């Protein structure tokens, strides 16, 4: 049940960013947000986060490639904490990282416990679970976050050179 609920939350947030559903910003607004966070190129970063949340959330909800879906979702949460929420403290009421931490922890709990018997992974005989799978998702997610922000800083647009 946790897998379906948490995956559904990510799908909803991804669709807000991707399509503008439920008063979300859509891709244009997400691109502007990425630009303001100096996540370059903003169009690529916007699509990456929107798809990671939508596809990763759907995969988590269905129990498809669960540790890999979890890694993508953890990457989005780690990046959100690092780029937006960390300096605001813990509580969500002050735009802190509370919500992101809860979602990332729930994702890790799903991976540690396994996708469950009613999942695509279980039907396919790929029922990975345990601390090793959770550790993989956590490390891969953190690495993904640092990769995305490293790419963002290396691809920062520069002003065109002026003619002398």
Where do the model's predicted regions map?
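Extended, low-polarity transmembrane helix blocks
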Residues: 1-17, 66-164
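Solvent-exposed, well-ordered loop and adjacent helix/strand elements within mature globular domains
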Residues: 9, 13-49
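Hydrophobic transmembrane-helix microenvironments that flank and shape a buried ionizable site
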Residues: 10, 47-50, 54, 64, ...
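Internal, well-ordered alpha-helical scaffold/interface segments
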Residues: 32, 49, 63, 73-76
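Juxtamembrane loop-transmembrane helix junctions in multi-pass integral membrane proteins
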Residues: 37-44, 64, 90, 94
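Short hydrophobic "helix-edge" motifs at membrane interfaces and signal-peptide entry regions
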Residues: 43, 56-57, 103-105
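Hydrophobic, membrane-inserted alpha-helices
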Residues: 51-60, 84-85
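Transmembrane alpha-helical segments of multipass membrane enzymes and assembly factors
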Residues: 60-66
């Amino acid at each position: 049940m946790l897998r379906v609920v948490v995956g559904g939350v990510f799908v909803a947030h991804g669709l807000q960013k991707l399509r503008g559903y439920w008063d979300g910003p859509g891709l244009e607004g997400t691109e502007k947000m990425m630009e303001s966070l100096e996540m370059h190129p903003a169009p690529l970063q916007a699509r990456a986060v929107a798809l990671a949340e939508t596809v990763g959330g759907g995969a988590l909800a269905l129990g498809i490639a669960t540790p890999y879906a979890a890694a993508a979702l953890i990457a989005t949460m780690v990046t959100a904490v690092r780029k937006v929420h960390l300096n605001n403290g813990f509580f969500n009421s002050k735009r802190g990282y509370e919500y992101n931490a809860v979602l990332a922890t729930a994702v890790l709990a799903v991976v540690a416990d396994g996708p469950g018997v009613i999942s695509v992974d279980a039907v396919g005989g790929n029922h990975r679970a345990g601390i090793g799978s959770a550790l993989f998702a956590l490390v891969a997610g953190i690495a993904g976050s640092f990769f995305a922000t490293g790419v963002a800083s290396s691809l920062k647009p520069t002003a065109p050179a002026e003619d002398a």
